[in-house]
Structures are given as C-alpha cells and as structure tokens.
Amino acid sequence: MQILNKILPQVEFAIPRPSFDSLSRNKLVKKILSVFNLKQRFPQKNFGCPVNINKIRDSVIDKIKDSNSGNQLFCWMSQERTTYVSSMINRSIDEMAIHNGVVLTSDNKKNIFAAIEKKFPDIKLDEKSAQTSISHTALNEIASSGLRAKILKRYSSDMDLFNTQMKDLTNLVSSSVYDKIFNESTKVLQIEISAEVLKAVYRQSNTN
C-alpha cells in the first residue's frame, strides 16, 4: 500500500464547526490542524528514564516473528493490519467522547469505517477491534526489559502520571513497530482518521 509521505502530528482536539464541502485535500488538512488542539502526544521525550524506542521496537518485531514463523507471519500481518487500523479508529472515536463530550451515533461510526476503507481499499476493517497483538507485545517487552519498573519508580507518587507515561510509551513503540512492519505511516493514517471523525461530528451536529 502506498501512503502519502507526509508526517503530521497526532493531536487532541476541540471542535468548532468547519465546512468541508469545498475544501481541497491540502485545505482540509489545514482546516483540521486549525480546529484541533495542537498538543502533540507523540513523541514524548521524557519518560523519567532513558528510552531507546528503536531497540524496543526491534525486540518486539523479533518476538512477533518468533511467534509467527513461515506462512503464519503473513496470516498474522493480514489480521493485525485489520485490528490495528480498526483500533486506531475506535480510539479516535472514544477520545472524541472523552475530550469533547461528543458521542457519535452507530451510523456515524459505520460511516467513518466506510470512509477509511474507501481511502485505503486494501485495508479490511473490523468495528469490534480493540487491543492489538502489537500493543500487547510492546507492553510485555516494556515490562520484561525493566523499563516499566524504572518508570514506576520515577512516578510512584503519581499513579495517574505513571499510567499516562506507560500508555504513551506503549503507543509510541506500537506505532514504530507498525510503521516498520507494514512500511506505512501511522501518523498519516491518524490524520485521515481524525479528519473523518471530525466530519462525522460536523454531520451529526447539523442533524440534531
């Protein structure tokens, strides 16, 4: 699959009501960036201890390959791509509800999945997907490498911050693993997903 070689930050957002009908692709991206809160979540540079993302990524990939030898690896890749991208969509929908109090209808959620499938026709999606194999393996690697213990020691007085650090680190490693295995950018996927979520919110707000 070929994805635009344009890296844009993953962001949290607050929503005015933009108009999308007459926007070209470049204008749409600018519009998204203008209405989203440009607080970058990744990469987070300080986890309370030295972190080598590439080293963790490579260890995760080795473990995935060890667990899925031969043709099994291709089956795993097909399923994981479905699960990973679907989970990105579900996470963006959930974040919209958490940060902005906007709960999308079932139909609007389906429309988001359909729009992403149309943009990336070689990716099959599953609305029920949640935790991915990559994320699970990344979390285990962070623990077994001793990083989790170091981060816990640093943030033991604030468990909310510890959990946030672990979530951010796991997501950062997972994104790096996905990018490497599938040779495509999760950041580009995320901006496309965020655009569709934002458009769904706009449509829903105009029908209520």
Swiss-Prot record:
Q: Which domain of life is it from?
A: Bacteria
Pfam families, per the entry: IpaB_EvcA
- InterPro entries from the entry? Bac_effector_IpgB-like (IPR004959)
Keywords, sorted A to Z? Plasmid, Virulence
Provide the protein name. Protein IpgB
